[in-house]
């Protein structure tokens, strides 16, 4: 088996995790107490879902995951929520005091007390696997726990499980909507270790997903639950091929191979289509070509970033539901002819497609319509660079005055770490510029003229 362990860190990670496991359980017909009624074995007795669930002798299905937070309230919601019987109590780890939006508290003082316990639990989960293929890490980089403890845990995972791939689903601070003043600090410090210790990081931001909810689902005042359920659909589509059988299945390591041209450039845009409310879906026939086009719309992106400002380096399309390879090939051919969607000239093909026959499931009572087919796109575009330049700019404004820095230094950080992380991101911005620049020969000539 190719198992995957999910790690949910901090409030954002845990709440996204709740939405994901809720959806997985629905997709596999697993009840909130972990039982799977035998008449409803969805894969016809096939055990592909064991990549995400382990089965006990009593026939209970336990998620291969761990929830980790430095303060108890969010984890307590899981402990008392609908799915409290699904998780093993040891999988829910919470500390006593908060990271207080402070990267240094999450990474140095409070985080290091809990990280060994977490690694111990992860070790138990890993021993329970026959062929662990990697980790999915869910966190946000604006707060203290997700950024500080998140990067600490990733660093430790690199030491303990060097060869296993790590996929991050990371909520980045939005351009306009902010939940903390020190977000730019936390994000820059955290991205510094994401660069080093994740293989692929899918970027999400709340503002972009709010806009999608308002625009496509007609929700006037979206809540975090609405956002998380949308994110869960994306993650479910990505992992569907690990959990079901299909015509073109995609492994976790395949993502890396196809999406990451250079190790540092592994920050991805994601989008999902069709996002459509139940009332509208009744009147629309969503063909493969239509949903493929929708996935490339700038408005479908799950992070505030306009792909028209950059070029695509690679792109992964994961279809699910009633889709055949012929339709996919036709849609991709159409996309290639569009002038607006530009690829870098050193990457001529640029598309990786996956097809899975399990149609998308929706959580009952939720705003998304039940559709026959859906597509999730993960793409590597040079436009992602603008997210980092936006962050860096905010970081610089604060750091020039050394505002709020004493909170970090007081928790045992050194000021040098700020400048080190900032330089690393400056280098990343430069990497994005160079990758998007004209072709290989052009670069060579330019250098010749300069010297």
Swiss-Prot record:
Name of the protein in question: Tubulin alpha-2 chain
GO function term, MF aspect, one: hydrolase activity
Function: Tubulin is the major constituent of microtubules, a cylinder consisting of laterally associated linear protofilaments composed of alpha- and beta-tubulin heterodimers. Microtubules grow by the addition of GTP-tubulin dimers to the microtubule end, where a stabilizing cap forms. Below the cap, tubulin dimers are in GDP-bound state, owing to GTPase activity of alpha-tubulin.
SUPFAM superfamilies: Tubulin C-terminal domain-like, Tubulin nucleotide-binding domain-like
Residues annotated with N6-acetyllysine modification: 40
Location of the active site: 254
Originating gene: TUBA2
Keyword Metal-binding: yes
Protein's organism: Chlamydomonas reinhardtii (Chlamydomonas smithii)
Record's subunit section: Dimer of alpha and beta chains. A typical microtubule is a hollow water-filled tube with an outer diameter of 25 nm and an inner diameter of 15 nM. Alpha-beta heterodimers associate head-to-tail to form protofilaments running lengthwise along the microtubule wall with the beta-tubulin subunit facing the microtubule plus end conferring a structural polarity. Microtubules usually have 13 protofilaments but different protofilament numbers can be found in some organisms and specialized cells.
Presence of keyword Metal-binding: yes
């Amino acid at each position: 088996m190719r198992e995957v362990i999910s790690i949910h860190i901090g409030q954002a990670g845990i709440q996204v995790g709740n939405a994901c496991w809720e959806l997985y359980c629905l997709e596999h017909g697993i009840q909130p107490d972990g039982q799977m009624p035998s008449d409803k074995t969805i894969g016809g007795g096939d055990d592909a879902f064991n990549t995400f669930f382990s089965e006990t002798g009593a026939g209970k299905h336990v998620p291969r995951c761990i929830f980790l937070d430095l303060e108890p309230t969010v984890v307590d919601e899981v402990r008392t929520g609908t799915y409290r019987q699904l998780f093993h109590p040891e999988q829910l780890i919470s500390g006593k005091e908060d990271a207080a939006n402070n990267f240094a508290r999450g990474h140095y003082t409070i985080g290091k007390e809990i990280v060994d316990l977490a690694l111990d639990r992860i070790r138990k989960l890993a021993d329970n696997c026959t062929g662990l293929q990697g980790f999915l890490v869910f966190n946000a980089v604006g707060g203290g726990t997700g950024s500080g403890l998140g990067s600490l845990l990733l660093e430790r995972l690199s030491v303990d499980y060097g060869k296993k791939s790590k996929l991050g689903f990371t909520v980045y601070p939005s351009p306009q909507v902010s939940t903390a003043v020190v977000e730019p600090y936390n994000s820059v410090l955290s991205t510094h270790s994401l660069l080093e210790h994740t293989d692929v990081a899918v970027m999400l931001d709340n503002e972009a997903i709010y806009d999608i909810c308002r625009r496509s689902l007609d929700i006037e005042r979206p809540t975090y639950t609405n956002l998380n359920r949308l994110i869960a659909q994306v993650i479910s589509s990505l992992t569907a091929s690990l959990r079901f059988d299909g015509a073109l299945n995609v492994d976790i390591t395949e993502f890396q191979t196809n999406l990451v041209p250079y190790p540092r450039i592994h920050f991805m845009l994601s989008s999902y289509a069709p996002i459509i409310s139940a009332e509208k879906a009744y009147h629309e026939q969503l063909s493969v070509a239509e949903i493929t086009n929708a996935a490339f719309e700038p408005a479908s992106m799950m992070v505030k970033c306009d792909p028209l400002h950059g070029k695509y380096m690679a792109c992964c399309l994961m279809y699910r539901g009633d889709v055949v390879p012929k339709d996919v090939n036709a849609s991709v051919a159409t996309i290639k002819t569009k002038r607006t969607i530009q690829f870098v000239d050193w990457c001529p093909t640029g598309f990786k497609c996956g097809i899975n026959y399990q149609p998308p499931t929706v959580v009952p009572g939720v705003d998304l319509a039940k559709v026959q087919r859906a597509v999730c796109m993960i793409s590597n575009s040079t436009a992602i660079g603008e997210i980092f330049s936006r962050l860096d700019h905010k970081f610089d404004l604060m750091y020039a005055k050394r505002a709020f820095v004493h909170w970090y230094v007081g928790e045992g950080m050194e000021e040098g770490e700020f400048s080190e992380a900032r330089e690393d991101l400056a280098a990343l911005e430069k990497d994005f510029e160079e990758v998007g620049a004209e072709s290989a020969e052009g670069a060579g000539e330019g250098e010749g003229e300069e010297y």
